[in-house]
Amino acid sequence: MDASYNITPDGKSHYGFLLTVGHSLVGLKGGRIKTVVRSSTEAEIVGVNEVTSELLWARDVLVELGFPQDEVLIAEDNNSCITMLQTEPRNFQTNSRHVRVKWAFYRQEHEKGILKLFYCPTDIMRADLLTKPLRGKVFRDHDLAIRNGAPMAI
């Protein structure tokens, strides 16, 4: 999962994610964050919220088809986002109500043991393809890794 902060003329941000089962890409989605966020961390939190909804749906489909699922992993390259999403409710601070609601949704699913965030270094964050222009070798490396089913981050 990746988000790009304030990249449009109207101050909006983008998010994107790749959905994999094993090492196979089975879905992807990207889009514009509808509200203006005030930091890259808030953009990432909103993006994680979008991913959470999609992952819960995909997990339910797999369970319904008879494939029991462990916790779903979400790769994140923003340490501040990871820290905020793992913060206990009494310590979470934000002035943005919409960010607090999105944080609460992730926390709810995390506390059920369904979702888990992990740090993924930016240089192997394949979702960058959906959120920002990549040049030359970086683009080709991500594209090749996705096509070959290399281990990747969401």
Spans of model-derived segments:
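RNase H-like nuclease module associated with reverse transcription
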Residues: K34-I154
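RNase H-like nuclease fold core
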Residues: M1-T41
